[in-house]
Amino acid sequence: MFEALKSRLTTPRRASRSRNDVLAECSDLARLDRLRRHARDRDTRQRADARYRALLVGGDASLRLEDRVAAVQVCTDDAVLAYVARSAREEIVRRAALDRLDSDRVLMEVALNDPIARLRRRAVAMMNDPELLQNVLHRGHPDDPRIARDAGRRLRELQV
């Protein structure tokens, strides 16, 4: 009996929560960003990336809106910015991501699909690829004819 007690005291206790549980509850964007980029374990990187993205788009109420916008404003990962521009709940977060994007393809997706007209029009105004602008011009937005007009205007601006 003494040996059993001694071994329980000298062997390290297993953490009551797994690393996955800790990541799933983590709300520290800086820590998650470091983990998703630098963790040795691929599974940890993937889980940290998923949690980071979920927090940025508003999938968890544990973060203030201002903190999410600030994190987007310093984000340098184009894939994350594209995801946030397409998926964030709040217009201000999508706009912060949109302002940092360099991808005309993502801008086109926003121009054609975002529920907020201001963001659709802003995306068109930021586009520089004539072929993709032509696509927006022809497809337009079913509820907003201004998108096609804006695309035509932007095409003319680029031709000058």
List each model region and its residues.
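Alpha-helical scaffold segments
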Residues: 1-160
